[in-house]
């Protein structure tokens, strides 16, 4: 999972730079074409281009694609218009959102301790986005929206048949994101990218594939309670990229909010693990 987060953080760092020059739809399309080509080549070499899929898997695959497309569009929009570390930190309330959605949609029972962690964790998000101050950036709402699309993506990933190759899932996801760029293209003015920008987009495609493959493998075969905490490693990568390339020094509110989000997220997972083990006794 740490390798997956490195891939995603590296992609984000490049996208933030490219987003100052190219519109998002063009970024999605060009990066997508490169990613689709590389993934198709990988699937071909592994004889996984044509896969037999049970009909009852179609809905889960479709929901996963919808979740991935939604989180990609919303998060990249936020990323281009926010500090890299801030946008990334907001995404780390994912474990809290997973628990919240499990209660609302899956009717899972959650005690007062985890409810308290959820409330405190979302308070940490508020500290980062500063809704009542002059420093409020409404693009942070896009990052929050992306979280719930990631919840949809990850929950449906766990429902996928283990027999479906991770590379194939990554390929059809990349194709869908690429078509999303085409759909939004009439609403944005595309420009001819320079060689430097094109190479940067190629790098984002490589890092994206890196992140997707490891993420799919971890979420499918890993124990969620063990794997998900390693998502927080992306904060470290995002801060380093922000400081080195964008001179974005984390402020006190960002640090405080991030600590709260990570602490409550870890507590929520370990409390859930404790509750399940207690019920099995």
Question: Language-model segments: which ranges?
Answer:
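Hydrophobic/small/kink-forming positions within alpha-helical transmembrane segments
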Residues: 5-10, 40, 65, 69-73, ...
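Juxtamembrane helix-entry segments on the extracytoplasmic side of multipass membrane proteins
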Residues: 29, 53-57, 125, 130-149, ...
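Helix-helix packing/entry segments at the starts of transmembrane helices
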Residues: 30, 87-93, 160-176, 213-243
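C-terminal transmembrane-helix exit sites in multi-pass transporters
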Residues: 75-77, 94-116, 236-255
């Amino acid at each position: 999972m740490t390798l997956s987060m490195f891939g995603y953080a590296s992609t984000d760092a490049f996208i933030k730079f490219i987003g100052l020059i190219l519109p998002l739809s063009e970024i999605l399309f060009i990066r997508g074409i490169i990613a689709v080509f590389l993934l198709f080549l990988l699937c071909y070499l592994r004889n996984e281009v044509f896969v037999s899929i049970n009909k009852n898997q179609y809905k889960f695959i479709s929901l996963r694609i919808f979740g991935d497309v939604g989180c990609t569009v919303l998060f990249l929009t936020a990323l281009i218009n926010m500090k890299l570390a801030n946008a990334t930190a907001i995404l780390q309330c994912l474990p809290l959102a997973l628990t919240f959605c499990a209660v609302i949609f899956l009717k899972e029972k959650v005690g007062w301790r985890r409810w308290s962690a959820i409330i405190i964790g979302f308070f940490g998000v508020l500290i980062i986005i500063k809704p009542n101050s002059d420093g409020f950036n409404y693009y942070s709402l896009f990052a929050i929206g992306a979280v719930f699309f990631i919840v949809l993506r990850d929950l449906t990933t766990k429902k996928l048949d283990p027999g479906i190759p991770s590379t194939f899932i990554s390929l059809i996801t990349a194709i869908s994101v690429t078509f999303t760029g085409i759909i939004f293209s009439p609403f944005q003015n595309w420009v001819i990218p320079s060689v430097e920008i094109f190479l940067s987009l190629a790098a984002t495609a490589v890092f994206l594939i890196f992140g997707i493959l490891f993420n799919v493998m971890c979420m499918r075969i890993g124990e969620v309670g063990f794997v998900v905490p390693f998502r927080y490693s992306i904060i470290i990568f995002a801060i380093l990229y922000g400081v080195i390339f964008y001179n974005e020094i984390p402020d006190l509110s960002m640090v405080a909010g991030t600590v709260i989000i990570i602490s409550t997220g870890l507590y929520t997972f370990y409390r859930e693990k404790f509750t399940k083990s207690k019920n099995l006794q």
